[in-house]
Amino acid sequence: MISFDDFAPAPGVPIYLQILRYIQRGAAAGRIQNGDELPSRRVLSALLGVNPNTVQKAYRLLEETGLVCSHTGAKSYMVLNDETVRAIRQELLESEVRALVTAMRQTGAGKEDAMGLMEKLWDECGV
């Protein structure tokens, strides 16, 4: 079962989107695999202290994108393959890098400064 033990809500971002992104990031990083079971909507809402409709909204979006298979009254499972995981990873990275580039340009940083900082932090933040 997918664990939400390290889920940390951020202020200013709707919780349903944070749940969606948490699952997408887990899939992109390989922590969430094809066939992994998601907690029930009721269990996850109690765990996170949010309204069950919030969890339902996140799960519905995951179902609409084909990442989750659910049946009424049954468990929900991840539906992932290599191509899907690559697409998720690409989408997440593009979104994050786009926000970073926008912020750097707004502070007046040039491309060379940005790339230099990226190289420095890449080495420092080795995971």
Task: Describe the role of every protein-language-model region.
Residues M1-E37, V43, E91, S95, ...:
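Extreme N-terminal segment that seeds HTH/winged-HTH DNA-binding domains in transcriptional regulators
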Residues I23, Y59-R60:
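Short, hydrophobic-biased segments on the C-terminal half of alpha helices
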Residues E37-L38, S70-M78, D82-E83:
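Short, Lys/Arg-rich nucleic-acid/phosphate-binding segment
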Residues V79-R98:
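A surface-exposed regulatory interaction patch that couples sensing to output
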